[in-house]
Protein backbone atom coordinates (compact mmCIF):
# COMPACT_ATOMS: atom_id res chain seq x y z
CA UNK A 1 0.00 0.00 0.00
CA UNK A 2 1.27 3.45 -0.95
CA UNK A 3 2.01 5.89 1.89
CA UNK A 4 0.39 9.34 1.92
CA UNK A 5 3.53 11.12 0.68
CA UNK A 6 3.88 8.82 -2.33
CA UNK A 7 0.14 9.03 -2.96
CA UNK A 8 0.24 12.84 -3.02
CA UNK A 9 3.33 12.87 -5.22
CA UNK A 10 1.61 10.58 -7.75
CA UNK A 11 -1.45 12.83 -7.90
CA UNK A 12 0.72 15.88 -8.56
CA UNK A 13 2.85 14.04 -11.13
CA UNK A 14 -0.26 12.85 -12.98
CA UNK A 15 -2.45 15.96 -12.72
CA UNK A 16 -0.17 18.97 -12.26
CA UNK A 17 3.12 18.28 -14.06
CA UNK A 18 4.29 21.92 -13.94
CA UNK A 19 4.17 21.95 -10.15
CA UNK A 20 5.50 18.40 -9.97
CA UNK A 21 8.69 19.29 -11.85
CA UNK A 22 9.07 22.58 -9.98
CA UNK A 23 8.83 20.69 -6.68
CA UNK A 24 11.73 18.46 -7.70
CA UNK A 25 13.95 21.55 -7.38
CA UNK A 26 12.90 22.05 -3.74
CA UNK A 27 14.98 20.62 -0.89
CA UNK A 28 14.13 16.93 -0.43
CA UNK A 29 12.82 17.43 3.10
CA UNK A 30 10.28 20.04 1.88
CA UNK A 31 8.95 18.00 -1.05
CA UNK A 32 6.38 15.88 0.84
CA UNK A 33 4.76 19.04 2.21
CA UNK A 34 4.67 20.66 -1.21
CA UNK A 35 3.27 17.51 -2.81
CA UNK A 36 0.54 17.37 -0.14
CA UNK A 37 -0.31 21.04 -0.79
CA UNK A 38 -0.46 20.56 -4.55
CA UNK A 39 -2.40 17.28 -4.25
CA UNK A 40 -4.96 19.10 -2.10
CA UNK A 41 -5.16 21.81 -4.77
CA UNK A 42 -5.72 19.16 -7.46
CA UNK A 43 -8.44 17.54 -5.37
CA UNK A 44 -10.47 20.73 -5.04
CA UNK A 45 -9.71 22.04 -8.55
CA UNK A 46 -11.01 18.91 -10.27
CA UNK A 47 -14.28 18.60 -8.38
CA UNK A 48 -16.30 20.01 -11.28
CA UNK A 49 -15.06 17.24 -13.55
CA UNK A 50 -16.15 14.59 -11.05
CA UNK A 51 -19.74 15.73 -10.48
CA UNK A 52 -22.71 16.05 -12.82
CA UNK A 53 -24.16 19.16 -11.19
CA UNK A 54 -23.04 21.89 -8.76
CA UNK A 55 -24.69 20.76 -5.50
CA UNK A 56 -22.63 17.55 -5.08
CA UNK A 57 -19.56 19.67 -5.81
CA UNK A 58 -20.52 22.11 -3.07
CA UNK A 59 -20.96 19.18 -0.70
CA UNK A 60 -17.44 17.97 -1.49
CA UNK A 61 -16.02 21.45 -0.94
CA UNK A 62 -17.88 21.63 2.38
CA UNK A 63 -16.33 18.29 3.35
CA UNK A 64 -12.87 19.68 2.60
CA UNK A 65 -13.59 22.85 4.62
CA UNK A 66 -14.70 20.76 7.58
CA UNK A 67 -11.58 18.56 7.32
CA UNK A 68 -9.36 21.65 7.24
CA UNK A 69 -11.11 23.10 10.28
CA UNK A 70 -10.37 19.97 12.30
CA UNK A 71 -13.70 18.21 11.93
CA UNK A 72 -14.29 14.76 10.38
CA UNK A 73 -11.16 13.35 12.02
CA UNK A 74 -11.81 9.68 11.21
CA UNK A 75 -12.80 10.38 7.60
CA UNK A 76 -9.77 12.63 7.13
CA UNK A 77 -7.45 10.01 8.59
CA UNK A 78 -8.71 7.49 6.02
CA UNK A 79 -8.23 9.88 3.07
CA UNK A 80 -4.54 10.06 2.07
CA UNK A 81 -4.62 13.65 0.81
CA UNK A 82 -6.71 14.89 3.74
CA UNK A 83 -4.42 13.17 6.23
CA UNK A 84 -1.34 14.59 4.51
CA UNK A 85 -2.60 18.17 4.26
CA UNK A 86 -3.74 18.23 7.89
CA UNK A 87 -0.28 17.07 8.92
CA UNK A 88 1.42 19.69 6.72
CA UNK A 89 -0.83 22.44 8.11
CA UNK A 90 0.10 21.44 11.66
CA UNK A 91 3.82 20.88 11.02
CA UNK A 92 4.27 24.20 9.19
CA UNK A 93 1.79 26.34 11.14
CA UNK A 94 -0.04 27.11 7.90
CA UNK A 95 -3.04 29.45 8.16
CA UNK A 96 -6.18 27.33 7.92
CA UNK A 97 -8.18 30.37 6.78
CA UNK A 98 -6.16 30.46 3.53
CA UNK A 99 -7.25 26.88 2.80
CA UNK A 100 -10.85 27.68 3.69
CA UNK A 101 -10.81 30.65 1.29
CA UNK A 102 -9.41 28.34 -1.41
CA UNK A 103 -12.33 25.95 -1.02
CA UNK A 104 -14.82 28.82 -0.97
CA UNK A 105 -13.32 30.32 -4.14
CA UNK A 106 -13.59 26.96 -5.91
CA UNK A 107 -17.39 27.16 -5.70
CA UNK A 108 -17.08 29.48 -8.73
CA UNK A 109 -15.70 26.55 -10.72
CA UNK A 110 -18.95 24.63 -10.26
CA UNK A 111 -21.15 27.17 -12.05
CA UNK A 112 -21.16 28.88 -15.43
CA UNK A 113 -21.88 32.31 -13.98
CA UNK A 114 -20.01 35.15 -15.68
CA UNK A 115 -17.27 36.96 -13.81
CA UNK A 116 -18.39 40.61 -13.82
CA UNK A 117 -15.16 42.54 -13.25
CA UNK A 118 -11.41 42.24 -13.38
CA UNK A 119 -11.43 42.82 -9.62
CA UNK A 120 -13.64 39.72 -9.20
CA UNK A 121 -11.20 37.65 -11.27
CA UNK A 122 -8.28 38.94 -9.21
CA UNK A 123 -10.11 37.93 -6.04
CA UNK A 124 -10.67 34.41 -7.37
CA UNK A 125 -7.07 34.00 -8.53
CA UNK A 126 -5.78 35.51 -5.30
CA UNK A 127 -7.71 33.03 -3.17
CA UNK A 128 -6.65 30.09 -5.33
CA UNK A 129 -3.31 30.50 -7.10
CA UNK A 130 -1.73 33.30 -5.04
CA UNK A 131 -2.63 31.55 -1.81
CA UNK A 132 -1.05 28.37 -3.12
CA UNK A 133 2.23 30.17 -3.85
CA UNK A 134 2.19 31.83 -0.43
CA UNK A 135 1.53 28.53 1.36
CA UNK A 136 4.32 26.85 -0.61
CA UNK A 137 6.70 29.63 0.44
CA UNK A 138 5.81 29.05 4.10
CA UNK A 139 6.47 25.32 3.70
CA UNK A 140 9.83 26.09 2.08
CA UNK A 141 10.63 28.38 5.01
CA UNK A 142 9.99 25.52 7.43
CA UNK A 143 6.83 27.10 8.78
CA UNK A 144 8.40 30.52 9.28
CA UNK A 145 7.54 33.84 7.69
CA UNK A 146 9.14 33.78 4.23
CA UNK A 147 8.31 37.36 3.23
CA UNK A 148 7.22 38.11 -0.30
CA UNK A 149 3.46 38.12 0.26
CA UNK A 150 2.93 40.86 -2.33
CA UNK A 151 5.11 39.06 -4.87
CA UNK A 152 3.18 35.83 -4.24
CA UNK A 153 -0.03 37.74 -4.84
CA UNK A 154 1.07 39.09 -8.20
CA UNK A 155 2.72 35.82 -9.27
CA UNK A 156 -0.39 33.85 -8.42
CA UNK A 157 -2.65 36.12 -10.44
CA UNK A 158 -0.28 35.93 -13.42
CA UNK A 159 0.02 32.14 -13.16
CA UNK A 160 -3.74 31.68 -12.87
CA UNK A 161 -4.64 34.05 -15.70
CA UNK A 162 -2.12 32.28 -17.95
CA UNK A 163 -3.70 28.94 -17.05
CA UNK A 164 -7.22 30.24 -17.60
CA UNK A 165 -6.33 31.62 -21.02
CA UNK A 166 -4.60 28.36 -21.94
CA UNK A 167 -7.72 26.44 -20.86
CA UNK A 168 -10.16 28.82 -22.59
CA UNK A 169 -11.31 26.23 -25.19
CA UNK A 170 -11.84 23.59 -22.48
CA UNK A 171 -13.80 25.96 -20.25
CA UNK A 172 -15.85 27.33 -23.16
CA UNK A 173 -16.80 23.80 -24.19
CA UNK A 174 -18.42 23.28 -20.79
CA UNK A 175 -20.06 26.73 -20.80
CA UNK A 176 -17.59 28.63 -18.63
CA UNK A 177 -15.83 31.87 -19.46
CA UNK A 178 -13.32 33.28 -16.99
CA UNK A 179 -12.69 36.49 -18.95
CA UNK A 180 -14.52 39.22 -17.02
CA UNK A 181 -17.60 40.71 -18.67
CA UNK A 182 -16.16 44.23 -18.36
CA UNK A 183 -13.03 43.17 -20.28
CA UNK A 184 -15.11 41.55 -23.02
CA UNK A 185 -17.34 44.64 -23.26
CA UNK A 186 -14.32 46.94 -23.70
CA UNK A 187 -13.36 44.82 -26.70
CA UNK A 188 -16.87 44.81 -28.15
CA UNK A 189 -17.32 41.12 -27.36
CA UNK A 190 -19.86 39.17 -25.38
CA UNK A 191 -19.51 36.04 -23.31
CA UNK A 192 -21.63 34.09 -25.81
CA UNK A 193 -19.12 34.93 -28.55
CA UNK A 194 -16.66 32.60 -26.84
CA UNK A 195 -19.05 29.69 -26.33
Question: What are these model-predicted stretches?
Answer:
Residues 1-157, 161-195:
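Acidic catalytic motifs of isoprenoid enzymes
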